[in-house]
């Protein structure tokens, strides 16, 4: 069963931003601006990746997953572990997840990808049609 839908990858945007930093057109302080809440979420809810920080190169980046959705209530806007995401996907209808990479040393952070999780809502006004498989008569009967 495929859980992630409507996946958006921000790798090209990340590459362009890093090119700006490496060329000197964008300052390091402009991209190393993770707030304390994000850094704390990385410490307690994040998953260490195999990618080292592109700015300081001192440590592996940490991936933090943030959930958003009106029907999530107080959970919306919070960081969640992979295990919690699976649990939320079984309990709630569609909600979005934003994965941010963060360096806990220099505060580099960037959106890596976003996707939708949760039960798929049937389209409004859709009806189930009877087919030969679910009991309708066929022309040969």
PLM regions and their residue ranges:
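N-terminal alpha-helical interaction blocks
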Residues: 1-36
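Short cysteine/histidine-rich metal-coordination sites, predominantly Zn2+-binding motifs
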Residues: 67-78, 118-126
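Short, non-ligating residues that shape and space the ligands of small metal-coordination modules
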Residues: 59-63, 109-115
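Short, flexible, mixed-charge glycine/proline-rich loop motifs
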Residues: 36-50, 91-97
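C-terminal/domain-terminus segments
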Residues: 2-8, 113-141
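Short cysteine-rich clusters marking metal-coordination/redox-active sites
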Residues: 53-56, 103-106
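Short Fe-S-cluster ligation motifs
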Residues: 80-97, 137
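Long, charged interaction segments in nuclear RNA/chromatin-associated proteins
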Residues: 2-5, 46, 54
């Amino acid at each position: 069963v495929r859980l992630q839908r409507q996946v958006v990858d921000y790798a090209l945007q990340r590459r362009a931003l890093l090119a700006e930093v490496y060329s000197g057109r964008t300052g390091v302080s402009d991209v190393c601006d993770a707030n304390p809440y994000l850094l704390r979420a990385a410490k307690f809810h994040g998953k260490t990746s195999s990618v080292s920080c592109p700015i300081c190169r001192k440590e592996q980046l940490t991936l933090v997953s943030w959930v958003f959705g009106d029907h999530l209530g107080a959970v919306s806007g919070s960081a969640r572990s992979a295990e919690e995401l699976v649990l939320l996907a079984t309990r709630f209808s569609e909600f979005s997840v934003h994965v941010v990479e963060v360096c806990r040393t220099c505060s580099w952070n960037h959106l890596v990808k976003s996707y939708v999780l949760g039960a798929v809502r049937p389209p409004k006004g859709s009806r189930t049609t009877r087919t030969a498989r679910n009991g309708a008569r066929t022309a040969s009967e």
